[in-house]
Amino acid sequence: MQMQVLTAASSLPRATLLRPAAAEPWRQSFLQLQARPIQRPGIMLHCKAQLQGQETRERRQLDDDEHARPPQGGDDDVAASTSELPYMIESIKSKLRAARNSLGETTVSAYDTAWIALVNRLDGGGERSPQFPEAIDWIARNQLPDGSWGDAGMFIVQDRLINTLGCVVALATWGVHEEQRARGLAYIQDNLWRLGEDDEEWMMVGFEITFPVLLEKAKNLGLDINYDDPALQDIYAKRQLKLAKIPREALHARPTTLLHSLEGMENLDWERLLQFKCPAGSLHSSPAASAYALSETGDKELLEYLETAINNFDGGAPCTYPVDNFDRLWSVDRLRRLGISRYFTSEIEEYLEYAYRHLSPDGMSYGGLCPVKDIDDTAMAFRLLRLHGYNVSSSVFNHFEKDGEYFCFAGQSSQSLTAMYNSYRASQIVFPGDDDGLEQLRAYCRAFLEERRATGNLRDKWVIANGLPSEVEYALDFPWKASLPRVETRVYLEQYGASEDAWIGKGLYRMTLVNNDLYLEAAKADFTNFQRLSRLEWLSLKRWYIRNNLQAHGVTEQSVLRAYFLAAANIFEPNRAAERLGWARTAILAEAIASHLRQYSANGAADGMTERLISGLASHDWDWRESNDSAARSLLYALDELIDLHAFGNASDSLREAWKQWLMSWTNESQGSTGGDTALLLVRTIEICSGRHGSAEQSLKNSEDYARLEQIASSMCSKLATKILAQNGGSMDNVEGIDQEVDVEMKELIQRVYGSSSNDVSSVTRQTFLDVVKSFCYVAHCSPETIDGHISKVLFEDVN
């Protein structure tokens, strides 16, 4: 019969398994999760990766793994892009290196440039002329065809009007470029009414404060604008309301985000405010506010700051500058999530070292050493630095909490979705020594994000990104401990907007080092290469499975595919095929042997069969033909072949010993509850296949650190395997409280992987433990349908 295909979107809630309990649920191993029957017991729903002809499309009667057909769908374009991957990588490297001394790769703000253009010459002796004529020139060169100024790629009426009004006022102030002034004024006249229909979710920062000030300047210049337009009355009212809420003494007492919009305020005590300048000389990294302050004070540091800005941006200035911390952190985050960070290890390390130097005990700002910190940059820095082994304290979040609630900036008027999203991601990288603050932060952020999802309000006030709702849903549906690298990357390839994403400041702006089309193109090419290799490895693995007749031992082709997927979703680099296939083959063969031993367990004879298998494994000259147990003989043959295939020299003995230890965990009493031992077998196999284990084997035997890693991994995976069996109809005994126990142990594992100062165990080996544990977490967390959907998407659905 024709099977229906189920795929699982990341936004789907986790489903409860409802199929009838198996007569012997313990026979269903960690890998042998089947989707629910949809017609009658016995008919299994396989993922479309198996049944939709993908394999046939790839095989083309291949006899050798060295031949492959490129993915279908624009094959020529895909082949061209993958062949150009090395050039794309080098181009990105050059861009990252060129930005190493940058204070932020961002686009110019016409609004801020207009405020700079308004500054009167400081040494003019009373004569009126612009201090920055190059700002006037920039304005003249960058008018859009429709007469406006602003972001050319996206229309938000507040962005277009505030940029256009600022530029028209600047040109009119100096009486230059009359034709362009007229076109800009006409644009304002034709579009002012749109303000009444604008979406307040995407308001420009400080718009209700700064736009009326520009209108007042325009009125004083005699510009023909309907200042009584109904759309403006609401803005005037909001300005008065907001100004009334600003405590004047607090504004002058300490640095706050209000400094960013000083150009919209009057009657300021400049002597007090100038003490809050950033190290670069600005007021809260705002060129517009700094230009206004310069006009009022003539401060030399403000002048130098603005000169630096317009020199770096060809006469213009961004809406925020510097943004060096934000730029570096977000670019690293994007490269990691796109799955291509391994190409830029030295550049990323340099960026993170820079961020570490700028992280203070009370958090981080988006630019330099700006005194006003925010939870968004702090969370991103905390997460990335911890994941790269830096010593950072969770106490940095204490400064953003008040009465059980968290804020991005003190005194904010509304909460930011992305700030809470990034804080939620950061709160999951927990060490045992952390106080309860991270747990409290996680609970608060999750509740906030869940509420926003429930109301369908997944837009942010600081960025316009079509993929953001999907990003948030994925984070809520798949916690970090159950999110596999290739799954996250495959999903993020569809979420990442590249150059289409726009950020919201006083106007729209782009972050070219963060949102870059070349990143996306390179990531797609890299993932396509991964899929090509994966499909070949899958065909080879399936032939191995058939050749060894493992289906006769209860291993389904679906289990084989899932075993390979779990390995490939964690270890995906092309040069790590031996580790990836070693993981997959070991998991498959362990399932086959487990199935064989369970048959003997039913008769109380598992111990005897285990001894025979151990004896046969230990003897290289074992005479297969003398065994009356053909099943045992075929399994030993497959095991011997696996060892010969993946281990050489002394490593062969190490791999045999690993299997011996795993077999010894089987007893009549264990009834197959060997999830922890299977996890250790996988870790040892991966390490042996990589060549790392052999060179360090003796030292690892004496390492307390390594021993503790084994203990934690074994304990966690044993509990998770119990949970998986229960979900598949097994005993519910000892299941209660497993999640909490696993979470406690996960904290220690994370610390030992990312926060250990010991050199006994390499960082790659530590990561192997985490990869294996996360694969167990993933299977315990996901429904079979979700897993099948991920298999299809990661391995078989071409990247568009």
From Swiss-Prot:
State where substrate binds: K242, K461
Q: What SUPFAM superfamilies is this protein classified in? A: Terpenoid cyclases/Protein prenyltransferases, Terpenoid synthases
Q: Which Pfam families match?
A: Terpene_synth
One Gene Ontology cellular component: chloroplast
GO terms, biological process: defense response; gibberellin biosynthetic process
Per UniProt, where does Mg(2+) bind?
D374, D376
Keyword list, A-Z: Isomerase, Magnesium, Metal-binding, Plant defense
Q: Which cofactor does it need?
A: Mg(2+)
User: Catalysed reaction per UniProt?
Assistant: (2E,6E,10E)-geranylgeranyl diphosphate = ent-copalyl diphosphate
- EC number of this enzyme: 5.5.1.13
Taxonomically, the superkingdom here is Eukaryota
Instruction: Give the species.
Output: Oryza sativa subsp. indica
Please give the family membership noted in the entry: Belongs to the terpene synthase family.
Q: Which Gene3D superfamilies match?
A: 1.50.10.160, Farnesyl Diphosphate Synthase (1.10.600.10), Terpene synthase, N-terminal domain (1.50.10.130)
> According to its UniProt entry, what is the function of this protein?
Catalyzes the conversion of geranylgeranyl diphosphate to the phytoalexin precursor ent-copalyl diphosphate.
PANTHER family tied to this protein: ENT-COPALYL DIPHOSPHATE SYNTHASE, CHLOROPLASTIC (PTHR31739:SF4)
- UniProt name for this protein: Ent-copalyl diphosphate synthase 2
Q: Where is this motif: DXDD motif?
A: 374-377
Q: What is known of its domains?
A: The Asp-Xaa-Asp-Asp (DXDD) motif is important for the catalytic activity, presumably through binding to Mg(2+).
A single GO molecular-function term is: terpene synthase activity
Its induction note reads: By UV irradiation.
> Which EC class is the enzyme in?
isomerase
Q: What else is known?
A: 2 different ent-CDP synthases exist in rice, one being involved in gibberellin biosynthesis and the other in phytoalexins biosynthesis. Phytoalexins are diterpenoid secondary metabolites involved in the defense mechanism of the plant and produced in response to attack (by a pathogen, elicitor or UV irradiation).
Q: Where is this region: Disordered?
A: 52-80
